C-alpha cells in the first residue's frame, strides 16, 4: 500500500496569493527538539510571470551568500520549478516579517551593490550549469520586485 501524503505547496491556491511575499509554510520539530522553518519566498505572481533561468540562477547563488550574511541558521534556499520564487529552509523559529526584511535587504544589495566578482559559484568547478547566469537579469528582477514591495503576508499586502 502506498503512503498517502499531502504536499503543502500543491494545496496552496496560487490564484489568490499576492506576490512578492514571504510566507511561513511550516515549522517542523525534530525528535530532540530541533526546529526547522520552511518559507515560501514568492518573488513574482504565479501564473502571470516567471523569472528566466539565468536570472533566477544568479539570484539563487547571491541569496545563498547574502541571506547567510544577514541571519544565522540558513540551511538552504532553492528555486521553485515554476521559477516564481524560492523555498527557504532555516534552523530555528523565525517569523515571516524577519525573513521578509532579510530578503528585501538582500534584493537591495543585488539591485544596487553587486558586481560580477561578487557572485559566488560561477566557475565550471563550482557550479553545475556555470554558463547559465545573468547578473543583468538578476539586477533587473531585483529592482522590479523591490518596486512592488515585499509583503510578510501572502494573501494581503503588508509591506516590510
From Swiss-Prot:
Belongs to the LuxS family. It catalyses: S-(5-deoxy-D-ribos-5-yl)-L-homocysteine = (S)-4,5-dihydroxypentane-2,3-dione + L-homocysteine. SUPFAM superfamilies: LuxS/MPP-like metallohydrolase (SSF63411). The lineage of its organism: Bacteria, Bacillati, Bacillota, Bacilli, Lactobacillales. One of its GO terms (molecular function) is S-ribosylhomocysteine lyase activity. Its cofactor is Fe cation. It is an enzyme of class 4 (lyase). GO terms for biological process: quorum sensing. It comes from Streptococcus uberis (strain ATCC BAA-854 / 0140J). Homodimer. This is S-ribosylhomocysteine lyase. Keywords: Autoinducer synthesis, Iron, Lyase, Metal-binding, Quorum sensing. Its EC number is 4.4.1.21. HAMAP family: LuxS (MF_00091).
Amino acid at each position: 500500500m502506498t503512503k498517502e501524503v499531502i504536499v503543502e505547496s500543491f494545496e496552496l491556491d496560487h490564484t489568490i496569493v499576492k506576490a512578492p511575499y514571504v510566507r511561513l509554510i511550516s515549522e517542523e520539530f525534530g525528535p530532540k527538539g530541533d526546529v526547522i522553518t520552511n518559507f515560501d519566498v514568492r518573488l513574482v505572481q504565479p501564473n502571470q510571470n516567471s523569472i528566466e533561468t539565468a536570472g533566477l540562477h544568479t539570484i539563487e547563488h547571491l541569496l545563498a551568500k547574502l541571506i547567510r550574511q544577514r541571519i544565522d541558521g540558513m540551511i538552504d534556499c532553492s528555486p521553485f520549478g515554476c521559477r516564481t520564487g524560492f523555498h527557504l529552509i532555516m534552523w530555528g523559529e523565525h517569523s515571516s516579517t524577519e525573513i521578509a526584511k532579510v530578503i528585501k535587504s538582500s534584493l537591495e544589495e543585488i539591485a544596487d551593490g553587486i558586481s560580477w566578482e561578487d557572485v559566488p559559484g560561477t566557475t565550471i568547478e563550482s557550479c553545475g550549469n556555470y554558463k547559465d547566469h545573468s547578473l543583468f537579469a538578476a539586477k533587473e528582477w531585483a529592482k522590479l520586485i523591490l518596486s512592488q514591495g515585499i509583503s510578510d503576508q501572502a494573501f494581503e499586502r503588508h509591506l516590510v
